[in-house]
């Protein structure tokens, strides 16, 4: 046994000399597995469903869903959260459709946001790789995978066949990006669209664009859907949205959450505080009346939402208590401190 231990130690020493310290490590070494560093999605319910309080840094994330389901809104809210924590964010706008005014309404500091509108898919992914390798960018959003058009397709004629070209481009880029993303602790979000497979009789005919590579390289995959409209009389104020965590490498997957996206305002934090507060018995509900700490705060959900908007301190207190209760102990406390500091 001693001979084997000596041989292993000699091999480890040689590997460290050749490839640098930390090339091979024991998982039990102190400080090797730090707390997962996260960026909030802007939705309290989704942060809790993700199990770690947000989207994990140093990982690849995929957000996909039908048109007008809230994919870009969710990504922009994550950018706003990143900027509130003092981070730097970049938006690779392959669709050439970023609305700066809308982004500003969601809380994005537009003047500080790095934006690129590349001509080809290769250019977009090369820019992403250079930003990741700089180590100075905390969050990069690519909108969207479907718009990452290979150079050969752009230079070719309409109707030319380019079988599998985009899938090969994505596969090659992700092989190159993954290690750099981990080293730089950058969060990279790919927004993706849905397509239908032809001739599927049984099972789900839906698939995402860009081949299978992104499915494998993603640590978290979020399926976002619009499930209804929020109305005031005949006027539509927003969308009821459902997000399912279909893949999660950092916590248990398959959790789902519902929240409201209000047009021009983004994800309604106050509505989530009401729903989660009642569910976790932090906010009492008797008939149409809501109470907190024994004091009535409003009649009807809309009035309570208005109360939280006018009293951000109480809203912040409820959010902190929810995070500490529903997230892993150390993670919940850490994120609650960051949320309070940002406010």
From Swiss-Prot:
InterPro entries xref list: AAA+_ATPase, DNA_recomb/repair_RecA, DNA_recomb/repair_RecA_CS, P-loop_NTPase, RecA-like_C, RecA-like_N, RecA_ATP-bd, RecA_C_sf
Keywords of the record: ATP-binding, Cytoplasm, DNA damage, DNA recombination, DNA repair, DNA-binding, Nucleotide-binding, SOS response
Annotated compartments: Cytoplasm
Keyword Protein biosynthesis: no
CDD domains membership: RecA
Gene Ontology molecular function, alphabetical: ATP binding; ATP hydrolysis activity; ATP-dependent DNA damage sensor activity; damaged DNA binding; single-stranded DNA binding
Alphabetized Pfam families for the sequence: RecA (PF00154), RecA_C (PF21096)
GO CC, alphabetical: cytoplasm
Disulfide bonds: none
GO biological process: DNA recombination; DNA repair; SOS response
Xref: NCBIfam families: tigrfam_recA
Alphabetized HAMAP family for the sequence: RecA
Protein family (similarity comment): Belongs to the RecA family.
Function: Can catalyze the hydrolysis of ATP in the presence of single-stranded DNA, the ATP-dependent uptake of single-stranded DNA by duplex DNA, and the ATP-dependent hybridization of homologous single-stranded DNAs. It interacts with LexA causing its activation and leading to its autocatalytic cleavage.
Protein name as catalogued: Protein RecA
Species per Swiss-Prot/TrEMBL record: Coxiella burnetii (strain RSA 493 / Nine Mile phase I)
